[in-house]
Amino acid sequence: MDVEDTVKKLNLKFRNIEGERLILAITCDENKNVLMVAFMNEEALKKTLETGYMHYYSTSRKKLWRKGEESGNVQKLIKFYRDCDGDALLFIVEQKGVACHEGYYSCFHYKIEDGELKITGEYYSKR
Amino acid sequence: MDVEDTVKKLNLKFRNIEGERLILAITCDENKNVLMVAFMNEEALKKTLETGYMHYYSTSRKKLWRKGEESGNVQKLIKFYRDCDGDALLFIVEQKGVACHEGYYSCFHYKIEDGELKITGEYYSKR
């Protein structure tokens, strides 16, 4: 894959997010569980396509990060999709270990029940 | 559900997106297909919880919109989750008709194959 060429053909609509030019990256496993959502700048996208492993852009640390660089919980890219208006990509990955830094399989492990935030084992906190 | 109280308990981290205070809203069907991702301001979230139907915030039109208000393709809220850092919600909905204004079931119907953008019937363009 010619990464420069692919990124051009994606015709992405970068958004002004926290003062940076970013797109949304939704990451799912092969069973369609949503693992996380994060941001990507063009460099993070290129690194992802070049290496085959997910890279994101951290708005708080203002830098590129390779998912799992400290925890070892890397995400191997399998395939990806673009949405209709081009400001979001959906990545299907093979998740090593867990996606969430809080130790849960998915970052979406807080369920809202009866108006309360509850950590739940249901649906998004397990494979 | 006391909507004001629930929104407070969600303890959301609104992001500066296109100059507005917004969160990310990922919407999936009951089979875990990702239908779309859009933005919500606090008003859109409250309207969603009050009415039981998805409302988003359009950054281009700079206004609240009720999903399906013109097409009739409304999204009935079933349940929802918050992510670990509080800048995103994941909504599980019952989708009437199709989610995408281009006529596809999901907005993520462009697959990237061999570096090319292809409209695909696979995975995200059908139930």
Swiss-Prot record, chains A, B:
Magnesium among keywords: yes
EC number: 3.5.4.19
Cofactors that this protein relies on: Mg(2+); Zn(2+)
InterPro entries assigned to the protein according to its UniProt record, in alphabetical order: PRA-CH (IPR026660), PRib_AMP_CycHydrolase_dom (IPR002496), PRib_AMP_CycHydrolase_sf (IPR038019)
Enzyme class: hydrolase
Pfam families hit by this protein: PRA-CH
Domain of life: Archaea
Protein task: Catalyzes the hydrolysis of the adenine ring of phosphoribosyl-AMP.
PANTHER family assigned to the protein according to its UniProt record, in alphabetical order: HISTIDINE BIOSYNTHESIS BIFUNCTIONAL PROTEIN, HISTIDINE BIOSYNTHESIS BIFUNCTIONAL PROTEIN HIS7
Name of this protein: Phosphoribosyl-AMP cyclohydrolase
Native organism taxonomy: Archaea, Methanobacteriati, Methanobacteriota, Methanomada group, Methanococci
